[in-house]
Regions:
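Nucleotide-sugar donor-binding/catalytic module of glycosyltransferases
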Residues: 1-222, 307
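C-terminal subregions of glycosyltransferases and related glycan-biosynthesis enzymes
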Residues: 189, 211-308
Length: 308
């Protein structure tokens, strides 16, 4: 049977974490002979009783649950530290503290990953189901990406929701080879690696309930004006971040990609920042894309202005 490590980062999550822990322990992948799993948790300095709950679960399920307290470094560093510390395993899954996993989430992920290539890093993710704080479905939803996942998308947009990500030992080794000094989010970093050097599978079927509440920043407004405001706000917030992230990607993995056309594309993307006409030619000659047509149009403007 394969081995699987579920990696959770917690911070003041006492309100919902019991439901999440119970859903993790109810995963049927081990009963069905797909993968034996353990849950490894790093607490990022909680002060609301989260640590007491973690200690309770570790005491009740010592063969399944372990946790430790780290310094308050934020969610990105917390997940990367977990990847550095955990034992070797066939697969790894990222997990948030306030969601709810359907019992066959890991079974589905392992079945897909088992069928993917063995000579490259592989990543599985799925579309989350939006629910309210009581786990009741919301009218709005995260729509499936209309375009195929790929590096030309990953350079400028992330479609991987971290709490749905499951990946193999090869991808883990590439992440911990050298941690980035900057990345927008840990799940975006996985998307870049998988699409540049390996394979990704995006599952359109939701296998987690993605809880929306005051402590969760995902917006779900559906009015057209609100959507456009959110788009421009998101692009302004990422100003310079896309380039900075790709610079780190090239710094760390450049020696692995001498013949990799994706890496060459990323290098060219950074070079054309110096010239409007070079950016215009780049936009005409390459096929970078965002998943939504409206976002694609906005990014074309951002690229021409050099504000990426």
């Amino acid at each position: 049977m394969k081995t699987l490590q579920i990696l959770m980062s917690t911070y003041n999550g006492a309100k919902y974490i019991r439901e999440q822990m119970d859903s993790l322990l109810d995963q049927n992948c081990e009963k069905l002979g797909k993968a034996a799993f353990r849950i490894v948790i790093r607490d990022d300095g909680s002060s609301d009783g989260t640590q007491d709950i973690l200690e309770e679960y570790a005491g009740r399920y010592p063969e399944k649950v372990s946790w430790y307290q780290g310094e308050n470094h934020g969610v990105i560093c917390s997940f990367f530290e977990l990847l550095q510390r955990v034992d070797a395993s066939d697969y790894y899954a990222f997990c948030d503290q306030d969601d709810y996993w359907m019992e066959d989430k890991m079974t589905r992920a392992v079945e897909i990953l088992d069928a993917m290539r063995k000579d490259v890093p592989v990543l599985y993710c799925c579309r989350p189901k939006l629910v309210d704080q009581n786990l009741q479905p919301l009218e709005s939803e995260i729509k499936r990406p209309p375009m195929r996942p790929g590096f030309r998308n990953a350079m400028i947009e992330n479609i991987v929701t971290g709490c749905t990500a499951v990946f193999d030992q090869s991808l883990r080794e590439m992440v911990v080879k050298e941690l980035p000094q900057f990345t927008v989010m840990h799940d975006w970093w996985l998307y870049l690696i998988a699409t540049c050097f390996g394979e990704i599978y995006y599952d359109e079927t939701p296998y987690i309930c993605y809880r929306q509440h005051q402590g969760n920043v995902l917006g779900t407004k559906t009015r057209k004006m609100d959507e456009w405001k959110m788009r421009f706000k998101r692009f302004r917030g990422n100003r310079g971040n896309i380039s900075h992230q790709l610079e780190e990607f090239i710094r760390i993995f450049g020696d692995m990609g001498a013949e990799n056309e994706n890496m060459r594309l990323a290098e060219r993307f950074l070079k054309v920042r110096k010239s409007f006409w070079a950016r215009k030619r780049f936009l005409r000659d390459t096929e970078l894309y965002r998943q939504r047509r409206e976002d694609d149009r906005i990014f074309h403007i951002i690229l021409l202005l050099g504000n990426y």
